[in-house]
Amino acid sequence: MVTSVISAGDAANLGVQTTGGNDGVLVLRSGAAGAKVDALSIAAVGTATFVGEVAGVTAINSGQIGGRRNIVYNGEMKVAQRSASETGLGAASGYFTLDRWKADLGATAGRFTMAQVADGPSGFANCLKLTTTTADTSIAAGELFILSQKLEGQDLQQLKKGTSTAEQVTVSFYVKGNAAAVYVCEIYDLDNNRSITQSFAVTTSWNRIELTFAADTSDPLDDDNAGSFSVQWWLHAGATYAGGTFAVNTWNDVVQANRAAVSGFTSIFDSTSRTLFLTGVQMEIGATATDFESRSYGEELALCQRYYYQTVYGGSDTTIAHGTAGSATVAAQCGSTHPVTMRAIPTLAEAGTLTAYDGSANTDIALVTNSSSTTNVSFNCSASSLTLGRAVQILSNAAGDYLTVTAEL
């Protein structure tokens, strides 16, 4: 083997080179005396070859380093297919604006606006903003407001829940409000009716909250496309949910009265000046919150469309499906292809007014039957003045006319 020396080189650099300045291969060896092996060789052209595994940065939080750490969808609040802003909310639960983020509500007189706004911390263009518009300070026992996201069991198997090697999970997010507040973050095991909770404090400045939740060696999650975890933020609760004893970072069978029973819990409906801003939501394996994993808009949109999409108006008479006129009043089995494979067979709904055009007549339709699959939209609709056997286009004629396709959890 060629003898090597460590050379000071010039005043600014320290180099390792073969003696006499000759070209050669630099080899680093390791191992027991008499049994050393080449660990790293660097050719004269600079190519480095590692003989064994590079162990220094193989993992972040016990996971791979090439992305896909964040289990949450639309944590950057980029995608809002339904609407950028909705007001007067509070009477019923639902998905209203930002994709995958559901408002779960119960029996409250409080009302709020939910919006996607351009007021995120550095590096985040958007955030979710909640603004109370009607206060509710007389809180009945069964009242609640939870902001939640449900996750499929087949996307959570890496947590190894219910085994002796179950993983810790860290939830991190950026949050601020108009005033100081205390809320609760909960991971709810929908398969086994278990949950774990931690509280967090909100200030008037953007702060990153980092909450590491204990591993659960009891009760594995189902490996299917149904909801297994709900990651949720308690923002309002009556005594049914806040009248018990708060358990910090401990998995338990659900006791409803304990879920939001933290001391100093704040109701988002305590004043019409109350606001809450949220973005950069991440859930990952391990005890450390790594930097937020940003995804492109196109990728995030496709992930969200597994659960919901709506046809997009592109100008007068935008075609959203094709079919054949089965009679003068029926456009038989119209259809199109989903942009992505959906979680389950979707439900369809018509927003505004869609029309059927057969080359001469253009008449309003009403959905009659839905025979869609996870890959295709397929439906029958009623119309009028169609010609039997003609090809039919289903058209969107204005921005408010579209078809919604839903397979939410």
Describe the role of every protein-language-model region:
Residues 51-409:
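Extracellular and organelle-lumenal recognition/adhesion modules and their flexible linkers in secreted
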Residues 1-69, 284-292:
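Intrinsic low-complexity, repeat-rich intrinsically disordered segments enriched
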